Amino acid sequence: DTGSALVYGIFILVLFREGVTGNILIIGTMVVFLFIITLLINKLYVLGILVLVAAALFYFMKRNSRNILVLLSMLIISSGFVFTVDYTFENILEPHHKKRINVLLGKELDLRGAGYNVHQSKIAIGSGGITGKGFLQGTQTKYDFVPEQDTDFIFCTIGEEWGYIGSILLVILFMALLFRLIKLAERQRSDFSRIYGYGVASIIFFHFTVNLGMTIGLVPVIGIPLPFISYGGSSLWAFTILLFIFIKQDASRLQLL
């Protein structure tokens, strides 16, 4: 499914740490940008923008034939990709995925269907203000206006009950955990332990970022839990096992020859 594909896709960050060229990240960013912009505006306008950008780069590169050849190849590939966006969107994505993306991009306004969860989540977070309404005092969450408020949309519960301050504290706690994991990964003596540590940090970072993005309408709803906080035994066990395997590896690092 889409959620699993995105989770495994985050391992590109681990490969980047291990020496994979940063061009892959640049290409990936360009693909996502072209996909979104082609959904928003006519593909002919997108092609026009690509040609103008390429022409400007041609001018600045002047007589460097190698760079010009690379740029021309990228222009051809990008133009071909633009024409495949509609087919990909209409024939590969599931109907509910398409509807969520359209709601996210503002092409549809479905406050009683695909956009209901995000709309109610925004109301809950916004109504929390600076300090929140207090523990178990949130109206949107207390009266079940927000579906899945204890799993995928649990951040809106935190935002409504504890406000901006509580939300920022949660972000700080996760950032501290991630930086600590990266620091521990860097001091590992074996490649496997280091890669595993970065993998754990990447998975937690991705889940945290996408979960928050879902609740405030920055990314499509794809059903990803908030690590260690969302309700559900399987999620909690999975993240706990991931983390404690790495802690065991770190504790045993000095025993490696």
Q: Model-derived features: where do they sit?
A:
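Transmembrane alpha-helix boundary/anchor motif
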Residues: 80-83, 92, 96, 173-180, ...
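A juxtamembrane structural motif centered on a specific transmembrane helix
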Residues: 211-257
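Interfacial segments of multi-pass membrane proteins
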Residues: 6, 11-27, 140-163, 226, ...
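Alpha-helical transmembrane bundle and helix-membrane interface signal
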Residues: 2-73, 85-92, 187-189, 246, ...
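Hydrophobic alpha-helical transmembrane segments
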Residues: 162-178
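Hydrophobic, glycine- and aromatic-enriched re-entrant/interface helices and adjoining loop segments
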Residues: 38-164, 191
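Alpha-helical transmembrane segments of multi-pass membrane proteins
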Residues: 5-12, 172-175, 199, 236-243
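Loop-to-helix entry and N-terminal half of a specific, functionally important transmembrane alpha helix
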Residues: 182-222
